[in-house]
């Protein structure tokens, strides 16, 4: 009985400490030793993010392109901020996405005043529909909303581009 109580207490302590840790963007970058020059960062890049899910489905059908749903926590998720900067703000990604993807950002911020109530509702609906539980998540769907591929969590930024290319190639 003592062993069970001790193991339960240890488990609770570990889970609590993991949830309490705040990940800083600097520590993520330092620990991964990312060479950001490889993807040629450009702060002024403007991607063509579509406003709504329904609009993204229409464009996907019309242009025969997969939809990339980017699930992020823009105001709290440090790995999301790194991915946003080091993947989505590159000339290489812009070129690929302009030709081959329909982009939809699904932001789940902690500060609800960052988005309209309608957009928050839509984003929460999409999070539940596709059962997204970790951030960042890149989820690809077809024009009917059927999931094609998904990559959850943060990995070194350079790994995302070949993954996205393979999804586009196989679509």
Report the location of each language-model feature.
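A short beta-strand-turn-helix
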Residues: 49-67, 97
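Thiol-based oxidoreductase modules, predominantly thioredoxin-like and allied folds used
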Residues: 48-50, 86, 93-121
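Coil residues (strongly favoring Ser/Thr
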Residues: 26-27, 31, 44
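Hydrophobic beta-strand anchors of alpha/beta hydrolase catalytic cores
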Residues: 68-69, 103, 138
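Non-catalytic, surface beta->alpha helical segment in thiol-disulfide oxidoreductase systems
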Residues: 125-171
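Bacterial Sec-dependent N-terminal signal peptides
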Residues: 1-24
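Conserved redox-active cysteine motifs that mediate thiol-disulfide chemistry
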Residues: 72-88
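Short pre-active-site segment immediately N-terminal to redox-active cysteine/selenocysteine motifs
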Residues: 64, 72-76, 134
């Amino acid at each position: 009985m003592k062993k069970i109580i001790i193991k339960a207490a240890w488990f609770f302590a570990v889970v609590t400490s993991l949830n309490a840790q705040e990940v800083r963007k600097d520590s993520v970058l330092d620990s991964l030793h990312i060479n950001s020059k490889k993807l040629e960062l450009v702060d002024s890049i403007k991607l063509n993010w579509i406003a709504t899910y329904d609009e993204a489905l229409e464009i996907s059908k019309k242009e025969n392109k997969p939809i990339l749903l980017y699930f992020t926590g823009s105001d709290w998720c440090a790995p999301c901020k790194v991915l946003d900067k080091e993947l989505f703000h590159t000339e290489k990604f812009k070129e690929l996405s302009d030709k081959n993807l329909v982009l939809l950002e699904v932001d789940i911020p902690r500060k609800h005043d960052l988005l309209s109530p309608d957009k928050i509702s839509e984003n929460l609906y999409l999070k539940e529909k596709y059962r997204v539980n970790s951030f960042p998540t890149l989820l690809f769907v077809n024009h009917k909303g059927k999931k094609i591929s998904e990559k959850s969590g943060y990995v070194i930024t350079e790994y995302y581009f070949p993954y996205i290319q393979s999804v586009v190639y196989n679509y």
